[in-house]
């Protein structure tokens, strides 16, 4: 994610792979790196405690913490990135393309209902995820968009990595 944001900002970042955002966040906390990327849910406690400063997050909207601190969306600073937000973790439900349309519709209805359930919304709020339900062609288009941006970014910044 940091490389994608850096690419839109026109700045060079040295990519250092970690096994997840929590490990990257700890690397930032320990001074191994100057900028660390990860999911908001992976570093929000350190932001609340004043151990880390959040510069931006890759959701579509600003996030206001219970203490009033605002974690701004990167879209506030880089308007060109807005069509690609949110960038980050997704929950997907995948089926074969030749699945019967009636079955697809039943799955879609169940998936949307589950994603809109109180329990799922509570989990999303707790982890600061933003609900963005896409199905069918809209989901295909979004997946292709994110894949294209990711591949292009990695090819430019880390040639031969993919």
Report the location of each language-model feature.
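C-terminal lobe and pocket-closing loops
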Residues: 43-115
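Ligand-binding pocket segment of bilobal, Venus flytrap-like solute-binding proteins
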Residues: 1-71
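Hinge/capping helix and adjacent helix->loop/strand transition within the periplasmic-binding protein
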Residues: 1-24, 74, 90-123
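Phosphate-coordinating loops and pocket residues in cytosolic domains that bind phosphorylated ligands
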Residues: 30, 76, 125-126
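Short, highly charged low-complexity linear segments
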Residues: 33-34, 61, 88, 146-154
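Solvent-exposed, flexible loop/coil residues
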Residues: 22, 78, 135-137
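An extracytoplasmic/periplasmic, membrane-proximal ligand-sensing/linker region
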Residues: 48, 102-162
């Amino acid at each position: 994610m940091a490389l994608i944001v850096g690419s839109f900002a026109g700045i060079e970042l040295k990519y250092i792979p970690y096994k997840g955002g929590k490990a990257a966040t700890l690397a930032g906390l320990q001074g191994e790196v100057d900028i660390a990327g990860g999911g908001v849910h992976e570093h929000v406690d350190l932001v609340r405690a004043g151990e880390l400063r959040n510069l931006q997050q890759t959701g579509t909207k600003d996030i206001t913490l219970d203490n009033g601190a605002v974690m701004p969306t990167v879209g506030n600073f880089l308007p060109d990135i807005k069509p690609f937000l949110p960038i980050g973790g997704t929950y997907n439900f995948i089926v074969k393309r030749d699945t019967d349309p009636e079955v697809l519709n039943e799955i879609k209805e169940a998936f949307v209902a589950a994603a809109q359930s109180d329990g799922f919304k509570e989990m999303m709020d707790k982890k600061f995820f933003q609900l963005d339900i896409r199905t069918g062609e809209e989901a295909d288009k979004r997946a292709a968009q994110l894949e294209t941006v990711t591949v292009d970014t990695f090819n430019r910044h880390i040639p031969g990595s993919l």
